[in-house]
Regions:
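Extracellular adhesion/carbohydrate-binding repeat motifs centered on closely spaced tryptophans
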Residues: 2-184
Length: 184
């Protein structure tokens, strides 16, 4: 069982143990404190702005999702909740926001590329996406396509600025129809 070394005022510990709250905050102290053995609480524990989740037996949850209300949170190998990062599990990529919640039905910008998290939270890949009346193509890496792209034997152009598919317009000296397909 992993031990957390933190400082905690005796009054703070007594107050935490008396509340029965699922959210526990361990403050600064000079002793070695094991939140599981000390509090025997289940639920969320805040250790100096690092969040952990303990099951009904007081064990830290690791390498899995925690469902809390309408949100899911990824608990890392060390038991800490992931924040503002990619999570790769079961062959899929997910994004968790700054609060640690799994993102869904939302665009995520990372390193100059745009990615779309579907309704189930997975990064969409190798697929068309219609979003608010605009079409996009999400590549094998999940990044939204930019520039010319051949798909199914047809050529399409995706704007560099917002990755949207051009349609019924001229792209340089080339024309694309209402469906975005290059007209030779």
């Amino acid at each position: 069982m992993k031990r957390f070394t933190k400082t905690m005022a005796a009054l703070g510990l007594a107050a935490v143990m008396g509340t029965g709250s699922a959210f526990i905050s361990l403050a600064d102290v000079t002793t070695s404190v094991n939140p599981v053995a000390t509090s025997r609480k289940s639920g969320w524990v805040d250790v100096q702005n690092h969040w952990y989740y303990f099951d009904a037996n007081g064990n830290p949850v690791k390498n899995q999702w925690i469902q809390d209300g309408n949100n899911r949170y990824w608990m890392q190998e060390d038991g800490e909740m992931s924040k503002q990062k990619w999570v790769y599990t079961e062959g899929q990529w997910y994004w968790v926001n700054a609060q640690g919640a799994q993102a869904s039905n939302i665009w995520v910008e990372d390193g100059g590329s745009w990615y779309y998290m579907g309704g189930d939270g997975r990064m969409m890949t190798n697929t068309w996406l219609e979003n608010n009346g605009t079409w996009y193509y999400l590549t094998e890496t999940g990044a939204a396509a930019r520039g010319w792209k051949e798909l199914g034997g047809k050529w399409y152009f995706f704007n560099d600025s917002d990755c949207s598919m051009a349609n019924d317009t001229m792209v340089g000296q080339y024309r694309v129809d209402a469906n975005g397909v290059y007209i030779p």
